[in-house]
Regions:
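The conserved beta1-alpha1 loop
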Residues: 90, 101, 106-107, 128
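Cap/lid segment of the alpha/beta-hydrolase catalytic domain
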Residues: 110-180, 184
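Alpha/beta-hydrolase fold nucleophile elbow
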Residues: 185-192
Length: 192
């Protein structure tokens, strides 16, 4: 909460005023806390090769919303691992080839649908971190959160090797999402 000069929460209309803000002094002086593992570059080269071995195929593109400004599609794209890339792709109406900037949104780690984002001045792709279905009922996400995805990043067994870490495939889905988005014919080819 925002504080008054007296250290009390500032209010407006009887409610605390809250906002987020970050800052840093000499951020360029920040140093890495631990060194990269000796095989870091070799490991990621191997992971990128595995990703490249799976052709980036559009598995599903379903129109879920049409507004005055945009078409919104629920898309799924092939990827390594057990889940595809999933997300909402919003393309402004009347977009011509190479006419628009691109914004890719990586939507945190919560077990939920990616949000629909519409902007008539850009292509927007909201990527679901888990590659799960979007736009489903709350019970679907609760079941995943309490079951299969419960403590997904904190499981000791899954974190014994980098290959079995949950975040390995999450990162590869994010990279595939970017690869897909950059292949869209409406993207201007430079503004990302």
């Amino acid at each position: 909460s925002l504080l008054t000069p007296y250290g009390l929460p500032a209010q407006s209309g009887g409610r605390n005023i809250q906002n987020g803000l970050g800052g840093g002094v000499e951020p360029e002086a920040l140093k890495q806390g631990t060194p990269d593992p000796a095989d870091f570059d070799v490991y990621w080269k191997k992971q990128l090769e595995a990703l490249a071995a799976v052709p980036p195929k559009l598995l599903e593109k379903k129109l879920v919303k049409e507004s005055n400004q945009c078409f919104v599609y629920d898309v799924k794209i092939s990827c390594v691992g057990k889940r595809p890339v999933s997300g909402y792709l919003s393309i402004p109406k009347g977009a011509g080839p190479k006419s628009l900037p691109l914004r890719v949104w990586y939507e945190g780690y919560g077990v939920s649908s990616a949000p629909i984002r519409e902007n008539p001045a850009e292509i927007s792709f909201s990527v679901n971190a888990h590659g799960i279905e979007n736009g489903r009922e709350l019970a679907y996400y609760k079941e995943l959160e309490q079951g299969e995805l419960h403590n997904y990043g904190l499981r000791a067994a899954g974190n014994q090797k980098p290959e079995s870490s949950y975040f390995n495939n999450m990162i590869l889905r994010d990279l595939r999402a970017l690869e897909f988005a950059r292949s869209l014919p409406e993207w201007d080819g430079s503004t990302l």
